[in-house]
Amino acid sequence: MILLVNLFVLLSVVCVLLNLAGFILGCQGAQFVSSVPRCDLVDLGEGKICFCCEEFQPAKCTDKENALKLFPVQPCSAVHLLLKKVLFALCALNALTTTVCLVAAALRYLQIFATRRSCIDESQISAEEAEDHGRIPDPDDFVPPVPPPSYFATFYSCTPRMNRRMVGPDVIPLPHIYGARIKGVEVFCPLDPPPPYEAVVSQMDQEQGSSFQMSEGSEAAVIPLDLGCTQVTQDGDIPNIPAEENASTSTPSSTLVRPIRSRRALPPLRTRSKSDPVLHPSEERAAPVLSCEAATQTERRLDLAAVTLRRGLRSRASRCRPRSLIDYKSYMDTKLLVARFLEQSSCTMTPDIHELVENIKSVLKSDEEHMEEAITSASFLEQIMAPLQPSTSRAHKLPSRRQPGLLHLQSCGDLHTFTPAGRPRAERRPRRVEAERPHSLIGVIRETVL
């Protein structure tokens, strides 16, 4: 870079000097031609020439330095005038060239000086920064950075606006329960669907569980069979349970569950279609094998035949029936959330939120009606069969299609699909009913309908 700068400086100086010399010489020649007033044609021995002299008489122009000789291509006056014009043009052109060279050199020098000055300033600034880094920063001069935007703003931007402080930490908000679109209000569904029914049944086929026997007599006590199954009192009140547990039907308070000493392996399951329950045939006539759901739904007296319950080795999630779209925990959370909404004035709600609350309220009412209907039917059948005292020796094995074995339903809503329409027929045949009485609430209702 320095070599190029030096070369430019040298060329600029040479160009300016040459143009200046040409300007000076051109001006001198033009001045000399202008000083010669006239030119005469003189015949010399070699030929004719135009002889120009300062004097009016050519004889007096003996000095060659003061005389101008021109070849007569044209008349002498025309040649003299043309030479004069050429010299003046050359002088003006040299002057213009000298000016351009001076301006170009000056601009280049200014640019070089400005660049060097900026470099000097930068070096000074860097030195000052180094000195600043060496000093300890003042805490008062610190400016905190702007916090980044919330990562969850886009997730809640499409969901209905609600005051999240009014909802407890154990309450599931509405968008996570109902996956639908109500008047342009977009809500979300749970990301993890329940496992398929066939996968649960196929996994249960590969396991063998221990046995439990429901004995007769003794005081009223209930031992929980599994974490996935809970009891429901006869009055129809459903206790609060964790989100992982599923609700079952009622168990009488006079039932006692005791572990049996002898254990045996259970036969493999027989898989049927989705619309038909999966039945586990029992090898003993007086002790049919029941699942966790069927055992908790059984309403029997202490003096009936013993019921053997199977307790598996798998986790609690796969022992109970597959979960429905809205499980009991979400159901209770929704009731609590709707109750909190109803505590507020309807004037403060938007029309969309008000209509959403009304829709959920109607759904909850329908579910309560179905649950109350099932509990009422079970209580009614229990009152009918209470006076009956069946003997364990009279129990016999039912056909495979009518045997009340392990019942796995598609959802909790299957309870209200059975109605006690055959109650008079059950009253007309009390002895046969007590001999063939099934061991689950759903089996009782189904047998009554048939």
UniProtKB/Swiss-Prot annotation:
Q: List GO terms (cellular component aspect).
A: early endosome membrane; late endosome membrane; plasma membrane; recycling endosome membrane
Task: Give TM segment ranges.
Answer: 86-106
Where does this polypeptide localize? Answer: Early endosome membrane; Late endosome membrane; Recycling endosome membrane; Cell membrane
According to the UniProt entry, which residues carry Phosphoserine?
S275
PTM note says: Monoubiquitinated at Lys-274, Lys-329 and Lys-365 by ITCH.
Residue ranges with Basic and acidic residues bias: 273-284
Assembly with partners or alone: Interacts with ITCH; enhances the ubiquitination of CXCR4 by ITCH and the subsequent endocytosis and desensitization of the receptor. Interacts with EPN1.
Annotated protein name in UniProt? Endosomal transmembrane epsin interactor 1
- Which gene is annotated as encoding this protein in its UniProt record? ENTREP1
